């Protein structure tokens, strides 16, 4: 997940209301993203799942 180094034309812009980009990965396999997209509030990471969030609405 790249927050500030946008690579045109592949970046994603999140809509209003869900204006944070995020990526969810499993703790043991951090190279494989499970899910990515837009969210309104960054979730807290747990023992099994790690969340990475941007503080912008644009990300790669």
Swiss-Prot record:
It holds the Pfam family Toxin_cobra-type. GO terms for biological process: killing of cells of another organism. GO terms for cellular component: extracellular region; membrane; other organism cell membrane. One of its GO terms (molecular function) is toxin activity. Keywords: Cardiotoxin, Cytolysis, Disulfide bond, Membrane, Secreted, Target cell membrane, Target membrane, Toxin. Disulfide bonds join 3-21, 14-38, 42-53, 54-59. InterPro entries: Cytotoxin_Cobra, Snake_3FTx, Snake_toxin-like_sf, Snake_toxin_con_site, Toxin_cobra-type. Expressed by the venom gland. Its main location: secreted. It is found in: Secreted; Target cell membrane. S-type are generally found to exhibit higher muscle cell depolarization than P-type. Shows cytolytic activity on many different cells by forming pore in lipid membranes. In vivo, increases heart rate or kills the animal by cardiac arrest. In addition, it binds to heparin with high affinity, interacts with Kv channel-interacting protein 1 (KCNIP1) in a calcium-independent manner, and binds to integrin alpha-V/beta-3 (ITGAV/ITGB3) with moderate affinity. Monomer in solution; Homodimer and oligomer in the presence of negatively charged lipids forming a pore with a size ranging between 20 and 30 Angstroms. Belongs to the three-finger toxin family. Short-chain subfamily. Type IA cytotoxin sub-subfamily. This is Cytotoxin 2. It comes from Naja mossambica (Mozambique spitting cobra).
